[in-house]
Structures are given as C-alpha cells and as structure tokens.
Amino acid sequence: MKEIIDGFLKFQREAFPKREALFKQLATQQSPRTLFISCSDSRLVPELVTQREPGDLFVIRNAGNIVPSYGPEPGGVSASVEYAVAALRVSDIVICGHSNCGAMTAIASCQCMDHMPAVSHWLRYADSARVVNEARPHSDLPSKAAAMVRENVIAQLANLQTHPSVRLALEEGRIALHGWVYDIESGSIAAFDGATRQFVPLAANPRVCAIPLRQPTAA
C-alpha cells in the first residue's frame, strides 16, 4: 500500500494542480461520450490506451469484459449500461478484450474452477463464445485462447444488444458499438468489422465499427 499512498501524494502535489480547472468543472457534472467495457486485468488501462482525460470515459470492468444478457433481475453491469446509455446518453460503446486473458484461457483450456465457484458461475456468460470456439480447429492452446478472446468480444456485443436501453438507442440512431482486442505486448488493437465479421487493425481502419450509427427507425 505504501506505493499507492505515495502515488496519491504525488498526484495531489504534481498532477492535480495541472488539471485543477478540469477537476473543478467535473466536480458537479460528467458528460462522457463513450462507455468502455473492459477486463479487470491490471495490464489493460482504458484511459492510458485511449489517452483520455478524467470525465471522458464511463468505464465498466470485470473478469472477461462480460455483459450478461438482460434478464428479470438485472445486476451491476446491466445497471451501469442502462445509466450510461439512458442517463449519460453516450454515443459509443466499446467492449475491449485483451491478449493473454486469464478468464478466456481458463475457458479455452477447460480448467477446473471448483475452487472459485463465483468465477466459474460468472464465466458462464461467455458460454456462447465457448461453443463457437470449441467447434473450430486450433493448432495449439495459445491460438485457441486468442480465438476465445475474439469470440468473447463478439458474444458480449450480442449480449449488449439484449439490453432495452441499448436496443432503443440503436433504433434511434444515436449509438454505435465497437468490439476491440488489445494486444499487451505490441500496444496494438484489432477491431471487429461488423460488415465483414473479421478483426482488422484499428490503426489502419479507424472508422471500423461492429455496429455503426444507423438511420433512426421510422415510427
């Protein structure tokens, strides 16, 4: 904890004064344009990867960057999605997986997680991705795990669209969905192209979307 407290003291001493005007503005309101849903993994820092300032991203993080399908008893992820879309009215949602994801590797390798029942239950929300991934050939476990990361991003994009707030925003043409996979070693991002159903380098394809803004559905 000493390093964390020392870091806070350095923030107060050096970083905060440089952004004092920004924090004063943010003290009473926020208006992020993007909901960023990522894994809890310590190696993926959304604000660092996207070079965003405080107030720019509304962030949800959990093991496996999972969005459970909407159900009769919505949980914390569902509530956060609804708030971001209906109250904050974000214009973009990013679901971001990453290389060497422990959760997806555990699924791909069929690891027994009886000693972590809560984790085991949570990862069931990636079952649709697991089924697709198991049906495809893979040369080795690392390639199978990497494919699982990609399939999971696609599956969570589908789950996201079961949420009423997201579905309405899509129909109204005021939100776009993005599926990314961040590579820790290279710092690159592969983005899911909804038109081709392929992942492509984001740097070379900055406009690619899983689901772009649509024309509003006629009443």
Swiss-Prot record:
Tell me its EC number(s), please. 4.2.1.1
Give the GO molecular function terms.
Answer: carbonate dehydratase activity; identical protein binding; zinc ion binding
Tell me the cofactor note. Answer: Binds 1 zinc ion per subunit.
Report the superkingdom from the record.
Bacteria
A Gene Ontology term for the protein's cellular component = cytoplasm
Checking Pfam families in the record gives: Pro_CA (PF00484)
Swiss-Prot/TrEMBL catalytic activity: hydrogencarbonate + H(+) = CO2 + H2O
Similarity-based family: Belongs to the beta-class carbonic anhydrase family.
What is the protein named? Answer: Carbonic anhydrase 1
Species of origin: Escherichia coli (strain K12)
What is the name of the gene encoding this protein? cynT
